[in-house]
């Protein structure tokens, strides 16, 4: 019988970013308790040798699984040292891969306080509204003028530590042009 291959999207991520993601997840699971229904699965609990960890995030009947890998083939850049992340949405026996933006939106629907579009209606009706959104990564569009006015009224406060964002985890920060720092006029630092 011939080999059957299954292809899946794995986002190449550097090791330090994966470690930051894991520590943020553990913080919000155990200390802030905002993600206390999440399940962190260690590498020794998996039978697959390339899986570094899994984070199972319940979303109603479904769940989102963020899997980190190690020991993969290196990428085209020197810093792609065989680390990667895949994001999967599961409902019973159905599984599909999702993009980081959608994963953040799904997480934001179920977890972390939000000052959302519904806050405009609640404020007009005189109801108490949540003063801020803890998960800005879950919003991908500009709000209405009323929403922007309400958010301007309430000063945003950044949660410490920040909410774990899947989009931030797989963000490609290496291909952005970086400025070198050094002494003024240094020939070696200016690239001349």
From Swiss-Prot:
Factors inducing expression: Expressed late during infection in a Rev-dependent manner.
Molecular function, one GO term: metal ion binding
Superkingdom classification of source: Viruses
Site note Cleavage in virion (by viral protease), residues: 150-151
Subcellular location: Host cytoplasm; Host cell membrane; Virion
Phosphoserine: residues carrying this PTM: 144, 165
Region (Disordered): 159-192
Residue numbers covered by motif HCCH motif: 108-139
Region (Interaction with host APOBEC3G): 40-44
Region (Interaction with host APOBEC3F and APOBEC3G) location: 54-72
Location of region: Membrane association: 171-172
Motif (BC-box-like motif): 144-153
Annotated stretches, region: SOCS box-like: 151-180
Membrane topology term: Peripheral membrane protein
GO cellular component, one term: host cell plasma membrane
GO terms under biological process: viral life cycle
Annotated segments matching region RNA-binding: 75-114
Record flagged with keyword ATP-binding: no
Coiled coil regions in record: none
HAMAP family (UniProt xref): HIV_VIF
Job description of the protein: Counteracts the innate antiviral activity of host APOBEC3F and APOBEC3G by promoting their ubiquitination and degradation. Acts as a substrate recognition component of an E3 ubiquitin-protein ligase complex: mechanistically, Vif hijacks a host cullin-5-RING E3 ubiquitin-protein ligase complex (ECS complex) and the transcription coactivator CBFB/CBF-beta to form an active E3 ubiquitin-protein ligase complex that targets APOBEC3G and APOBEC3F for polyubiquitination, leading to their degradation by the proteasome.
Other remarks on this protein: Vif-defective viruses show catastrophic failure in reverse transcription due to APOBEC-induced mutations that initiate a DNA base repair pathway and compromise the structural integrity of the ssDNA. In the absence of Vif, the virion is morphologically abnormal. HIV-1 lineages are divided in three main groups, M (for Major), O (for Outlier), and N (for New, or Non-M, Non-O). The vast majority of strains found worldwide belong to the group M. Group O seems to be endemic to and largely confined to Cameroon and neighboring countries in West Central Africa, where these viruses represent a small minority of HIV-1 strains. The group N is represented by a limited number of isolates from Cameroonian persons. The group M is further subdivided in 9 clades or subtypes (A to D, F to H, J and K).
Domain notes: The BC-like-box motif mediates the interaction with elongin BC complex.
Protein name: Virion infectivity factor
Gene name in the database record: vif
């Amino acid at each position: 019988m011939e080999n059957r291959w299954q292809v899946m999207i794995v986002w190449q991520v550097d090791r330090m970013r994966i470690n930051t993601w894991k520590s943020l997840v553990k913080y919000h699971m155990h200390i802030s308790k905002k993600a206390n229904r999440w399940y962190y699965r260690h590498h020794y609990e998996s039978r697959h040798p390339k899986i570094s960890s899994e984070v199972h995030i319940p979303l109603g009947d479904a769940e989102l699984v963020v899997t980190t890998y190690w020991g993969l083939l290196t990428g085209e850049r020197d810093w792609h040292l065989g680390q990667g992340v895949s994001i999967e949405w599961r409902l019973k026996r159905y599984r599909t891969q999702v993009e980081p933006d959608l994963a953040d939106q799904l997480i934001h629907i179920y977890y972390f306080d939000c000052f959302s579009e519904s806050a405009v209606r609640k404020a007009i009706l005189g109801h108490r509204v949540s003063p801020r959104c803890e998960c800005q990564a879950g919003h991908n569009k500009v709000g209405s003028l009323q929403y922007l006015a309400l958010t301007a009224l309430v000063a945003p406060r950044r949660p410490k530590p920040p909410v774990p964002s899947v989009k931030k985890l797989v963000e490609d920060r290496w291909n952005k042009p970086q400025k070198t720092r050094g002494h003024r006029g240094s020939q070696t630092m200016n690239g001349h």
